[in-house]
């Protein structure tokens, strides 16, 4: 799980109107609440979540977040009556075979077929990808590069070598029968490839996804809100297939973690 802070989501939302950013914040708040409730019920850890101290959030952003979160703080996502494991990532990937931006299913990412974590389209990723790209050969080390010729297209990229979290550990790129291997834990398990060389002739592979790509895309949520005026409920139901949204009693919220954070933010 890629950790999230409300200020990180806010930095993406700053490129759109305040009303659109609020719908994305609402969607994120409901997803986080659902995720924590799910892991609390099943006794697993949710330590991957990252919280920003309330006092570190600018007052203007704090006010906007407070307004967005207040109305949804008791809502969770359910599937067949049970709260869901509402995972999310910063940005969805790109399917080079279909040419469509979209999320990754839990089956493709982790080998577990979860009915509400299907692959869905997420078209508003491209505008944020430049801000999140990583360059193999600069941001990561490369090894086994034994050919100095440039200008030859890469023919394939083997991304099957992953750790237990689903993140690619290294790639083997093939060009005209020669292999180039790059190592390092990539920050995405599904992404768009763009190949080129730097000024010295070293091949660089750009990729633009960020995170595991399963569940809601934060960039996609902002895009749907800004470009289509989509509300948080429709955003959530798009990214989590077949879910319902229900209100739970305030007694379900513990005093620590996200809920303590929200109480301090909301002045409760």
Question: Over which residues does each language-model region extend?
Answer:
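Conserved, single-site charged/polar hotspot
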Residues: 1-268
């Amino acid at each position: 799980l890629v950790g999230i802070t409300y200020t990180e989501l806010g930095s993406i939302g700053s490129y759109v109107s305040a009303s659109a950013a609020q719908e994305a914040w609402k969607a994120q708040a409901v997803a986080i609440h659902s995720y924590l409730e799910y892991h609390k019920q099943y006794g697993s850890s949710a330590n991957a979540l990252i919280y920003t101290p309330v006092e570190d959030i600018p007052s203007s952003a704090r006010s906007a977040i407070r307004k967005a979160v207040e109305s949804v703080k008791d809502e969770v996502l359910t599937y067949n009556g049970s709260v869901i494991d509402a995972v999310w990532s910063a940005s969805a990937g790109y399917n080079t075979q279909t040419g469509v931006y979209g999320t990754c299913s839990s089956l493709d990412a982790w080998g577990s077929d979860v009915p509400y974590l299907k692959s869905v389209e997420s078209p508003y990723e491209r505008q944020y990808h430049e801000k999140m790209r990583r360059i193999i050969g600069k941001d990561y080390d490369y090894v086994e590069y034994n050919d100095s010729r440039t200008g030859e297209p890469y023919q394939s990229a083997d991304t099957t070598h992953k750790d237990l979290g689903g993140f690619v550990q290294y790639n083997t790129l093939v060009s005209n029968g020669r292999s180039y291997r790059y190592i390092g834990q990539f920050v995405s398990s599904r992404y768009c490839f763009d190949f080129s060389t730097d000024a010295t002739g070293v091949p660089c592979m750009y990729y633009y996804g960020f995170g595991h790509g399963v569940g809601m895309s934060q960039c996609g949520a902002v895009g749907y809100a800004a470009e289509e005026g989509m509300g948080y409920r429709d955003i959530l139901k798009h990214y989590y297939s077949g879910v319902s949204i229900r209100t739970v009693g305030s007694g379900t919220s513990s005093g620590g973690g996200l809920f303590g954070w929200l109480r301090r933010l909301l002045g409760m």
